[in-house]
């Protein structure tokens, strides 16, 4: 055993134990195209085996922010990895990508094999949901950089789309319909405000049970995993009915929906056309947050917004219903008369 490194605060043996524990979780994410297993210096993937004619690789990276601090407070670490995968694969799915493989990065103050196994198990769960292989990762034990009970988590997703099928919003025109896919909760954005409003201002804890939330523990509601939309979107992409997709993450409706819309056009959203989840009402009241500002921070119950030709609206809704995916017609594309590219009515 390397005593000098151990004395510096880095446990090589604990690192070996983590690798041993996560192998079975990695194995269940295997998919066509994966070459070999973990342990090499890089993850291998045979893109040619998938039969794409003009493949374009689409990449994304993200983390889960200070939602990790809620996981720490609740001592619940087995779902935070799903969030990490979701934040990455939803971003690339918004451009029409089929997720292929994923890598994770965990930095910690002290290598705790049991805890890190929970985290990676969650990453593997997310990869299975997304149809993405977990082909590698890094666990960095950094004493002095992090406290012993702290860790950070980030992920990297690579996907592929046919060049002709990339979804970039360029064909969106006035009159196109906006369809929203519901979120499962706060997802993984805005948690600095979440913690301030609920824990500091309102004085709640992760164990607080609120009638507005059905009597569930607040920590459990906040740690509900971010929804992965890959399988919901796939039939729509194959049918060619989607013109643009906005993943509603940091910045809420106000910042994310305009990202898919060409200049000169705007999204007109009819408030009240979908059910806003109770957690957002709790947050608004606890933090004394202006109602309109909520739409500039949180997803407000909608995790994805799709732009669809009105002639194909019913087809898109049927494809979603056939896949047991709820959907709401939120509004339409109009001329941009405000310069903001979005109007909430």
Swiss-Prot record:
Reaction catalysed by this enzyme: 2-formamido-N(1)-(5-O-phospho-beta-D-ribosyl)acetamidine + ATP = 5-amino-1-(5-phospho-beta-D-ribosyl)imidazole + ADP + phosphate + H(+)
Its EC number(s): 6.3.3.1
Record carries keyword Cytoplasm: yes
UniProt key word Cytoplasm: yes
InterPro entries: PurM-like_C_dom (IPR010918), PurM-like_C_sf (IPR036676), PurM-like_N (IPR016188), PurM-like_N_sf (IPR036921), PurM_cligase (IPR004733)
A Pfam family matched in the record: AIRS
Protein's GO biological process: 'de novo' IMP biosynthetic process; adenine biosynthetic process
Pathway: Purine metabolism; IMP biosynthesis via de novo pathway; 5-amino-1-(5-phospho-D-ribosyl)imidazole from N(2)-formyl-N(1)-(5-phospho-D-ribosyl)glycinamide: step 2/2
Matches recorded under NCBIfam families: purM (TIGR00878)
Family as reported in the entry's similarity comment: Belongs to the AIR synthase family.
Record's protein name: Phosphoribosylformylglycinamidine cyclo-ligase
UniProt gene name: purM
